[in-house]
């Protein structure tokens, strides 16, 4: 009986959060280990379906880099890199779009639907969801100032038209978005999935933006940091305490906050049911950044 009561108490712990977030939108960037391991994929799909059933509106933006690499290798398409950044020419972009929109996106949709959800897969091109422009990559070379490099059909979001997302949500669907957008010239552009998720969250005025990563969260001096303000994050970046691949994730969170998103989270996607732990428990998981 005690074990049963303990389970009931765990369920009741979620009640105030269900009440608080019911009817609200949560944008989730799905990538990393959570997309690679079978048990984590299943727990992710169950988390998303449960959110929908308790009245929360999840919107998913996904990555898919490893799948792109595998297909490029199998097709023997040569890849040029500039200081570690892939140059995306027309042939490479065709593969990127094929993998992200045609394969990975549909796998995620099927995964969610198999758990009882109603997911619909789209890209930034559908319903004029996103318009983008080509964007060079800023790279800081050792001992030199930052420089801009043209890496091809890689873009940044210029505008989001969330009408298609509102319509899908109204009909009870779960949008699953691949990070491909169209330029005004009609070119397909590959968009960083974290950045895309942040822009979607801002356009929807989401309650939360959650980035699933392959780390515990933001580590300062080797310790997990949470309850972080915008100003504190800027300070950490300026001092070099946040560096490398974590910087664009943090900047994406800050941009979302500037657009009206209440809370942003960088959490460990390697932990089973990390989304539910973050949303429905008192302790949460990972790093919280808020205004």
Curated annotation (Swiss-Prot):
Protein name: Acetylglutamate kinase
Cellular location(s): Cytoplasm
Keywords of this entry: Amino-acid biosynthesis, Arginine biosynthesis, ATP-binding, Cytoplasm, Kinase, Nucleotide-binding, Transferase
Source lineage: Bacteria, Pseudomonadati, Spirochaetota, Spirochaetia, Leptospirales
Gene Ontology CC terms: cytoplasm
Subcellular location, principal: cytoplasm
GO terms under biological process: arginine biosynthetic process via ornithine; L-arginine biosynthetic process
UniProt site positions, description: Transition state stabilizer: 29, 249
The protein's role, per its UniProt record: Catalyzes the ATP-dependent phosphorylation of N-acetyl-L-glutamate.
Keyword Cytoplasm: yes
Pathways involved: Amino-acid biosynthesis; L-arginine biosynthesis; N(2)-acetyl-L-ornithine from L-glutamate: step 2/4
HAMAP family: ArgB
GO molecular function terms noted in the UniProt entry: acetylglutamate kinase activity; ATP binding
Binding site for substrate: 64-65, 86, 190
EC number(s) reported in the record: 2.7.2.8
Family, per entry: Belongs to the acetylglutamate kinase family. ArgB subfamily.
Reaction catalyzed: N-acetyl-L-glutamate + ATP = N-acetyl-L-glutamyl 5-phosphate + ADP
CDD domains tied to this protein: AAK_NAGK-C
Class of enzymatic activity (EC top level): transferase
